[in-house]
Amino acid sequence: MDHMISENGETSAEGSICGYDSLHQLLSANLKPELYQEVNRLLLGRNCGRSLEQIVLPESAKALSSKHDFDLQAASFSADKEQMRNPRVVRVGLIQNSIALPTTAPFSDQTRGIFDKLKPIIDAAGVAGVNILCLQEAWTMPFAFCTRERRWCEFAEPVDGESTKFLQELAKKYNMVIVSPILERDIDHGEVLWNTAVIIGNNGNIIGKHRKNHIPRVGDFNESTYYMEGDTGHPVFETVFGKIAVNICYGRHHPLNWLAFGLNGAEIVFNPSATVGELSEPMWPIEARNAAIANSYFVGSINRVGTEVFPNPFTSGDGKPQHNDFGHFYGSSHFSAPDASCTPSLSRYKDGLLISDMDLNLCRQYKDKWGFRMTARYEVYADLLAKYIKPDFKPQVVSDPLLHKNST
């Protein structure tokens, strides 16, 4: 089923799993409590030997969720108590959302509609005391890059453009760092477009930006029609609340991309995305969780929701009939921790805000426990990669000398 946007911009409750918001809700409703508890242990892991604790949120945040009909969930990751360090607890939020108006509406109305839709969700994060908030990939617009039509470039804006100004006021109001992934137009370099995350500080200042490292060329995701691979490396942004990084969408499929943010000292890595069910849903709960484990940091995974229908049909280069939509963006935003625990996912079809308290001491504790940094062989990997990028590279393959001998 798909979550459709009607001509008046209203959304229907399609896109569920057999009528349930998420896999976790389906299992909870249909398994005996003792069975669900065991399944939950295997699906979500254990944080410091126990299930994640629920956070009691202010009534004002709950009221905003009820009034504006968005999913609101909150859970807490703890760490072991240490003698030499105090807990370093930070409250982090993720927002997933559908577009506000049909893609046929005037572009300025579409953007303003999304601003208006997100304002109460950001307010809920603010009154709930969120310190760092991340929005979804290209949150100011429909994910129109499947169409290959140039007119969607009009949604691009400078780093200090309209969306940043909108969020700067909220960042100051709530003393909140906000990660804002946008379609950037680089005014100083020939007005080239980039897929960019703008990091807005809790004082309303622009801390910096990161441009998407890996650009997909898979099915409808032919984004290189609009922008190419980023040029910002793997920056980690030191904020008053902790060290954060942004691995934008398709970068989650590249383990070395995750590794690089970890080597630069990230404690939380956000993965703002736009991905659809048929293509990637079985991979979604695995990749970020694996990255959190392998790199000893927290990961926040965000995916938009809904089915965005475009005016003109397009093809995918796979011989299948032309169509007017990507498919269903399945939401399911969640957090993963370095100890292999993770939160239940947000709804598969509703707008949502996921809040988590994280004790960042857990990052070092799991570096010490597993010793992945200590036991890694970076010099060996570096030597192989240095050889691999040369034209005369020869794979290190040892063949059986009898491999091609005729059998008797």
From Swiss-Prot:
It catalyses: 3-(carbamoylamino)propanoate + H2O + 2 H(+) = beta-alanine + NH4(+) + CO2; 3-(carbamoylamino)-2-methylpropanoate + H2O + 2 H(+) = (R)-3-amino-2-methylpropanoate + NH4(+) + CO2. CDD domains: ML_beta-AS (cd07587). One of its GO terms (biological process) is beta-alanine biosynthetic process. Keywords: Cytoplasm, Hydrolase. The active site is at E137 (proton acceptor), K212 (proton donor), C249 (nucleophile). Disruption phenotype: No visible phenotype, but unable to grow on uracil as sole nitrogen source. The keyword Cytoplasm applies. Homodimer, homotetramer, homooctamer; can also form higher homooligomers. Catalyzes a late step in pyrimidine degradation. Converts N-carbamoyl-beta-aminoisobutyrate and N-carbamoyl-beta-alanine (3-ureidopropanoate) to, respectively, beta-aminoisobutyrate and beta-alanine, ammonia and carbon dioxide. Involved in the recycling of nitrogen from nucleobases to general nitrogen metabolism. Belongs to the carbon-nitrogen hydrolase superfamily. BUP family. This is Beta-ureidopropionase. The gene is PYD3.
